Structure formats: C-alpha cells, structure tokens
Amino acid sequence: MTGRENVKFVSRLFSKKDELYDKINFVEQFSELGKYFDMPIKTYSSGMKSRLGFGLSMAFKFDYYLVDEVTSVGDEKFKKKCDVLFNSRHKESNFLMVSHSMAVLQKYCDAALFIGRHNNINYYDSVAEAINKYKENEGL
C-alpha cells in the first residue's frame, strides 16, 4: 500500500466523502514526502513513516490525540512545522502524551501519570511534581 492509498483508506473511516481530497492533499503537503507519497510504505525510512503518520493524525480534528514521542520527528524545519500545528490543535483538543522530553510535557500537559519501577502508577495534578518524581526515581 502506498502512502496515498493508506491516507485514502484512513480518510474514508474518519471523514465525509466530500472531504476526502482535502485530507489526502493535507497529508501529502504536510508530510513533504514528494514522490515517495505514491510509493509503497514498506520502502519508507522510519522518519518517512513518522512524517506520514503525524500528518495523517493531524489531518483530522479529534477531541483527544494519543501522542507518543511524535514531536521529535524530522529535521528542525519539520519539527517547527509540527510544533505550530500542535499548538493549533492544543487550543481545541486534548493530548494523552508519552514523552521523554520534559519541556514538551510541561508545555502541553495539565496533569501527569508517572509509571515507576515495579509498575507503580501515580497521578499528579502538577506536571512539575511528576517530573521531579521521575528524576528522583531515575537518579537524575
């Protein structure tokens, strides 16, 4: 399946028929894959797959996004582009994030779950408090 075919398939699940072209166009432009957008995904590098996946997830306006380290994708120019779009989505949506970037977590999160050694789970109303617990737990 090519990048375009994948985007078309997913778009059929999450958008109206008259929005299909706009979704495909958004992902094609945003991901900056060029000719690779029409090539099989199995030929993509991990970075290309991440760009396609991030662009595809951002093509839809959801109430909640599940985010796993995706903001670290690509070169500096692409990261800035992701950050601008992320900020836009953050104004109208919520994020459930997994990240090793403390700055990203502090920027986008209002509360935190910290899963420590032995799978101990703790909820924190303060992201800063969760980060301190993480650092303490990791000996940082």
Q: Could you describe each region identified by the protein language model?
A:
Residues 101-107:
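Conserved H-loop
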Residues 118-140:
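Conserved beta-strand-loop-alpha-helix hinge in the C-terminal portion
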Residues 107-114:
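Conserved catalytic segment of ABC-fold P-loop ATPases
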